[in-house]
């Protein structure tokens, strides 16, 4: 596996900006950049206290790639919405649409790339973890692959995301949107009452998420609020919770650390402060 070389911003000649002022930028030629250009801060302008101004400043100062090349966008636009019968016959996928899956993420999550399901069995619980099959769309050395390698990751700013892949993939075909058939890779296994895993298999699949849930909803359900979840998914979520407790118990017995690390949250007022 080859990783893209890290990009380093040279800030040796960084100037000083007075308070309440924001630097603007212009493009200048640079032989080592991918497209022959780089952004360079050259002057300051009165600060407009709003989200757009702050995020444009962050994008410019960090040299983040905020636009996709035309050929990358064209490659993403070629993919059509999924036709389940075609996906099952052409790509030899296992049909898991009847197996109730849910996604569980934070309230502010902007992409949903994994879904889970579980059911009680004699030996314990059978669980399914399904992730979006990005490799189906992003082939090695393709324009999409090269752009993803160049970017390395999606960048999450407080109220927006600079995605690693173009929107037709990042926010649609590779996002496990409730009620939409999606190409996935599934890891299926049995977890016994001691938290041991067995009968593990990984295979290409087709799922259809039943609900987009949040950690807050699930925690409220665990705390006894029966109205926290849609009734249609409550039984499956209960099985997911019980299976996860078995896995967690075994991890702790093996010496795993359980760290409660607070996550920063950026809150803006209406003026963008």
Model-found features: residue ranges?
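Catalytic-core elements of nucleic-acid end-processing and repair enzymes
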Residues: 131
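Charge-lined substrate channels and their catalytic hotspots, especially those that engage the 3′ end
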Residues: 2-126, 135-181, 212-222, 227-244, ...
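Catalytic nucleotidyl-transfer cores of nucleotide-processing enzymes
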Residues: 167-172, 176-205
